[in-house]
């Protein structure tokens, strides 16, 4: 089985746990030498299921049963994956087992001993204080520029007095609170898009119904919309219940849209770098409080592990790699699989377009982290960055060898390529198809914000973010400054991009639901690969680490999508294709 790490983003934490396991084994052997018989030592405390949250209550229900792992293509049971929840199910009888077993041998432990000289705290701090924000996986979730001051939308003459009075009392986004240290966490979040009518029903709070009314009036009667919006802004607050907080950020975005619609000058853009560390800590807070990213990485990695079977050479093509956080657990699982570790693992990294025109330095740091970690595992590893824009790449750039098992990964990445035309998405998918992959893993937000008109898009986004705000409200206290930061600098920015003033080519928050992705994937020649019962059960076990009142569940969407849902509303969807 692969070793469990409570923080799947911290590569060195995994290695340190393995060293701890080795030390316990050595102590056990010494005791056995002197006493001939001793019971096995307990698992390390770091292996125990745990979840760092501001509010946490343990489950009292029975732990979900785990089925037998599905056989690989070579007739053997695939390796065991790690996830950030802090627990794992081995293929054998015991809940906790030897991390490497006989197949790994003592040579692996001798390699891992070098981790004692590796400063894991320094590595984590480097992600916060040294590298620019855009050089991390956070760019997949957060817009780097903080919101500028909100211009008040000019109302009609009849509404001028009411608007001015309410605008004076209405709260405005303020500077982020001071940095607080956060527990380390894994990585990406996401969503499902109901019809406009069901979206209206799910946003039944009066303040949200008023927002929906404002959005409908925005195009036809901006003055009326401004007057109604003033009342909403007076009642909304970023410190209230989920509906009040949601209204706070949506009213802000709609206010900007109305202002720009009347020809108001754009606000000056502040320095995009100033909130880098703040956003990094927000990202960690969210992933410590909610299982979104853990679910996505766990499920995609399990599909890759099963599809590659006992292949001796494995080539992963990651469209959108930055830190490579997703691959720590998979490298661990491949290094400890029953069939033996691969003779070579190669990752080809295509940088996200949001890394900017010069991603080389960021990817070099990613290369170093992954290479050093693979060395600790005793794995022959190669990282190859492709620095040309994705639309300029062709099959020959990937240097696929005939005896390699290829896996292509799109983790919260393809939606960046959506636009008024799907041509760029289709081009990239056809490129992936040309590599003859054993599997293509796709993780996307489950909400329709691409082709929908503004009113429907506003309703879809409001319903989606309502679920996110509620899930965070259960995980963190109302007075938590960390919660305020996450909602302001992560969710607030994305709301701004989805329903703010930008339209056409300037609108960058273009997500699509699973049915739209199914159409695109099948058009490009892919067919769905059902996720195994084992992958489903691992995801169930991940959710078991969260309190039952969190109301998380797994929802299967046809033909082969698995979604993480809040109160049965899908938020993040993962699928596999070939």
Swiss-Prot record:
Changing residue 551 to A: Loss of DNA-binding. A motif (VHIID) lies at residues 314-318. It comes from the Eukaryota. It holds the Pfam family GRAS. Residues 205-264 are annotated as: Leucine repeat I (LRI). Residues 500-578 are annotated as: SAW. Residues 198-578 form the GRAS domain. Residues 283-349 are annotated as: VHIID. InterPro entries: TF_GRAS. Homodimer. This is SCARECROW-LIKE protein 7. It comes from Oryza sativa subsp. japonica. The gene is SCL7.
